[in-house]
Amino acid sequence: MKIANVALALVCVPVSYAQDGDALDEIRAEMARLREENARIRGELDRMNRARDPELDRLMRAQIGMAVDAAMAQVQSEQQMTAGWNDGFFLASEDGKFSMELGALVQFRFIHAHRPDPLRALQDPDINNWENRWGFEFARTDLLVRGHLYRPELQYFLNLGITREEPGLVNGLGFVKDLWLSYDFQNDWRVRVGQFKIHHSREESTPSSAQLAVERTLLNEALNLGRTQGIELTWSRPRDVLTFTTGDGASDPSSDNGLGFYVAPNDGTLPSMLNRNALKRDVEWFAALRWERLMYGSWSQFSDMTSPMGSAPAAMFGLSIHGQKGEATKVPTPNRDESRWASFAADISWEFGGSSAMLAGMYGYIDSGGFQDQYHIYGISAQYARYWAPKWEWFARYDWAELYGQNYTTEPDSTGNGGTVGYFAQADSGVLALGVNHYMDGHNFKWTTDLNFTIDQTDVLFFSNVASISQDGEDGQQVVLRSQLQLSF
């Protein structure tokens, strides 16, 4: 640097000033000072070179060179490759207009369930006649396909699942869970059309592969909105996201558990989540709205429920509302034959860099129409998780739900007079889960085990097939051990 300064000074001195004695003296003095400074720096560099091991210096230079070459080669290779592996299999056109990534999710479970008060002859008698049952299952087996068409802003997603043995589904049948197209307008707006999950509760919106426990809470199973076929609009800002959804109505996931009878005995609010006829009876109108506020941190931190060691603190708040009216038959009847359904959800999540927490509440109001029955379902859930080693995490979770309402034991007349009204309150249903996660390769390869204790009776309204928590008697305090090995890419 000093030598360069001298050269610059010599170039910049005009020849016309060469005869000026004072100017030449100043230049000579500055050159002498720079020569002394340059000599001192060279001496210091020579001393440092003599103190350094020549072989070590050669190896360091070679390693740095190889690392740079490898990085350059990887960048060039990824730019040129049209097929290969990059955290998943991918295909792409040479011009970059088309891409396809192939992924999969496999969840293999061992279940042991102890029920001291089974309800014999109800549900599956092979299960209910035994206090202790155990076995293995593939809870989820999904093939995931995603990518873009024509330009990166036009995204697509396909989720092909294999059904497990559940009520109303053929075991081992391949079916479409999600199939949608989305377009990002690059001006804070995004639109999605197709079949997809309704963005209502954070627990349901977070993928099953990114949960803390083996399965979601009974509260979520009772009150989440499932999937719809329709359109979704998303408005995003650095700290706020607003999502509006409309379409063929929410698909009540609890219909397989028993709530379906209370929600819609006439199928008024219960559209199937599978591909359905556009003109089939479903809803007269449906709307769902969710607002999320990022208080601090980044949005990507809330793509799962965990907060690894060393990650930054973050917090997010979410608020959701939903309403829909079932489609009437237009056939003259003495009573209203369409059902109505409204729900509300709120949640707040924290990440502390090595630990995480979430508190959520949900509420649902159902007017089932034909019997003029009205029901209120509500509950809360709370969870906390903490790492004790970089890849090991323990967690605790509790959820509680209750249903109360009124129904007519005898129907009123066509003018609404008469009839006998009965009021009832359903017993509380609560589950405490204690568990551990071992992240062998993040969520891509993960082992999860939890032990679940039902605090009170698990009745026909709140049991969950996929959670392996079954209906039991009044004195039933179940203990369910679930251990899951997950492969995801």
Give residue ranges: language-model regions:
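Outer-membrane beta-barrel pore domains
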Residues: 46, 115, 129, 169, ...
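Interfacial loop-to-helix transition and helix-capping segments at the boundaries
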Residues: 276-281, 337-341
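N-terminal periplasmic/intermembrane-space "pro-region" immediately following the signal or transit peptide
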Residues: 18-107, 113-121, 299-302, 484, ...
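Glycine-rich, charged/polar anion/phosphate-binding loops
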Residues: 274-275, 301-306, 343-346
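Active-site-proximal beta-alpha loop/turn segments in soluble metabolic enzymes
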Residues: 250-278, 328
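Outer membrane beta-barrel
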Residues: 84-253, 258, 281-298, 305-316, ...
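Sec-dependent signal peptide recognition
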Residues: 1-9
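N-terminal signal peptide c-region/cleavage motif recognized by signal peptidases
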Residues: 13-15
